[in-house]
Amino acid sequence: QVFDLAILDIMMPGIDGFEVCRQIRGGAAGSNTDMPIVFLSAKTEEFDKVLGFTLGADDYVTKPFNPLELTARVKSQLRRYTQLNPNSGARETVNNEITIKGMSINRDNHKVIVDGEEIKLTPIEFDILYLLASNPGKVFSTDEIFEKVWNEKVYEANNTVMVHIRRLRGKMKEDTRQNKIITTVWGVGYKIEK
């Protein structure tokens, strides 16, 4: 069975939510590796949140939670996912492609090609990369990235954006490239040069 979204608790019987997230992102049992993953957990420590995002979560909601807020977050993730998933039938295909720094990003089919190799990104990772690439040379602070990608105000400082940028860099093999795609402007934010 194919799912569009997973809501996981960290403390589940038999297998914890972190392991389920790891297996989904790893393609276990034919799972939809790109589907949004939302953690819903009583664990409120920053370590648990960062670990969840590092493993591939797109959102993390702590208990107790407001059911209306959770519903809004799920709808937001599904909306982003259906916009980026070419098989959803939710939008018409229009040539919406950016080519920059040896990388091609196609918004219509959610494909990213770096140095001739396709890389798989979660919807959040894709949105961050697309935001930076569609504004070459512009520096975005972590708060600006969070507000534009998650469509929410930042109420407290967190490492969410930095964790996603780190995962993006890992998938694009930034550590082996001489010309980095995503540049850190220390104390300011991130950008992709023209």
Where are the regions that the model predicts?
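Short boundary/linker motifs that mark transitions into or out of structured domains
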Residues: 96-111, 188
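His-Asp phosphorelay/catalytic-motif detector in bacterial-type signaling
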Residues: 2-4, 28-36, 154-155
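Basic, amphipathic DNA-recognition helix from helix-turn-helix-like DNA-binding domains
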Residues: 18, 22-26, 34-99
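Active-site phosphate/pyrophosphate-handling residues
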Residues: 16-19, 48-51, 75, 127, ...
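Positively charged, aromatic-enriched patches within helix-turn-helix-type DNA-binding elements
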Residues: 111-181, 185-188
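Conserved functional loop/turn residues at catalytic and ligand-binding sites
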Residues: 2, 54-56, 64, 69, ...
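Active-site beta3 strand of CheY-like receiver
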Residues: 2-7, 12
